[in-house]
Regions:
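Alpha-helical transmembrane segments and their helix-entry boundary regions
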Residues: 15, 214-217
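Rossmann-like flavin
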Residues: 71-192
Length: 223
């Protein structure tokens, strides 16, 4: 069995790479994943990360080295072991990163990594369901929605932050990330929008081969 490309790891990045490569006509791609398929309902139910984090079927269950800043404790370091990788077990929070950090990368000599360079790709990747803004994208594969949770204790926390001098923001991924507000989620119609859901599943729909097992201990998807 031969492929034009073999991608090791069907995590957040691997699913994107498989999607992009398999979009090219006549190209065959093998995507290898050490974990299993993302069939568990706990993966797709947003609150299900309480079940998937720390579970050996979906999490590598890493532990950090003891650290002086933690009083020499070792803590859990969840990493996804399933299609979609950590995007299938994380808390669904969507945060792009500070523009100043990207600009500093450029200042250090990394051409193509300034905020102005990467913003078009952030916009291309997302389907933002909130208010329109120049910094936000629509029509992309990764669905990003506003948090519609209404909890008095969170509202009180936000109000306390405002009283402490923080500015309330309705879109921390917009023009200015500094402030306090509800977080945004990678979710669509009440279901988690993981990298596998956003990039891999559509890829399998428009290519002819079906996912298949290449061994009893590995579950790759080929496109």
């Amino acid at each position: 069995m031969e492929f034009d490309y073999v991608i090791v790891g069907a995590g957040s990045a691997g699913c994107v790479i498989a999607n992009r490569l398999s979009a090219r006509a006549g190209v065959s791609v093998a995507l290898l994943e050490a974990g299993g398929a993302d069939r568990s309902p706990w993966i797709h139910i947003p609150v299900g990360y309480f079940k998937t984090m720390g579970h050996p079927k979906t999490d590598w269950c890493y532990q950090t080295e003891p650290d002086a800043g933690l009083n020499w404790r070792s803590i859990a370091w969840p990493r996804g072991k399933v299609l979609g990788g950590s995007s299938s077990i994380n808390g669904l929070l969507y945060v792009r990163g500070q523009p100043q950090d990207f600009d500093q990368w450029r200042q250090l000599g990394n051409d193509g990594w300034s905020w102005d360079d990467v913003l078009p790709y952030f916009k291309r990747a997302e389907n933002w369901e909130g208010a329109a803004a120049d910094e936000r994208g629509v029509g992309g594969p990764l669905n990003v929605s506003e948090n519609n949770v209404d909890r008095a204790i969170i509202d009180a926390w936000v109000e306390a932050a405002e009283q402490a001098g923080f500015r309330r923001t309705s879109d921390y991924n917009g023009e200015d990330q500094e402030g306090v507000g509800y977080f945004q989620m990678t979710m669509k119609n009440g279901r988690r929008c993981s990298s596998a859901a956003a990039y891999l599943k559509p890829c399998l729909l428009y290519t002819s081969p079906s996912p298949r097992d290449l061994s009893t201990s590995r579950m790759p998807s080929s496109a």
